Amino acid sequence: YWTNDFKPNYFSWHDFLQKDEIAIDAISDFITRGVIVINDAPSISNSLEELATRLGPIREVLFERIHNVSVDGHVYNIAHTSLELPPHNDFASYTWPPSVQALHMLVNDCEGGRSTIVDGYAVLRDLRNDYPEHFDILSNFAVPFREFDEENETYANEPMIRLNAEKEITGFRYSNQLMQMIDPKKKNVDAFYEAYHELCNRVNSEKYKSKFRLESGHILLVSAHRVLHGREEFKPDGKRHLQDAYYEMDNIENNLVLLKTSGNK
């Protein structure tokens, strides 16, 4: 697990796609730490399609296969403004949210707007140690999340923390933007909000935020059930265009096994 002194490792786009030994190193690091940056990628729209040979097929969502992020005054999503975007993960409104996200910076000519990432597992580990009762309620209390537009609707009612049979953390669902109103008469709602307040304070604490600038040709790859992403406010005095797409960790882990075994044939 890591906190604010963490810096992701960088891997060349060309080497990642063309050299199996580099792909093995990059994917292994990604699975272990939850984040890598691929640099020197083409600043060309839809280049994320080319990562399928290493990451597996793009995970389709209802809205767009590859999503464009730039300042647009006609949408409701805070990502399309120049305001600070707090740490979150995407599509908490899916029963199974995409487990990997790639954010490809095509152009970044604006001042400010550093990317922020948070190791959600580090936050939850510390919360579990300090306030086990908060951790327990967040692991069991179902929370509604919704994302929709004129044509599509996604809705999930799930706890924010996912555990396996051994009570190990296997997923973190966190999005203030998509979280919906909770029935005030629901059992344990007061305990939930007390725990949620503590969780929000930690997620937004400088203690956990790693910050760095994504330049043109950089692709930030995050393990989306673990790592939250966001950005600082920026001045919309130039062009800033980012594209993102989703993949699945199961496919990436499978590809790593194939890469390792193919070298032994």
Question: What spans do the regions from the language model cover?
Answer:
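Active-site environment of non-heme Fe oxygenases that use a 2-His-1-carboxylate facial triad
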Residues: 2-35, 40, 45-265
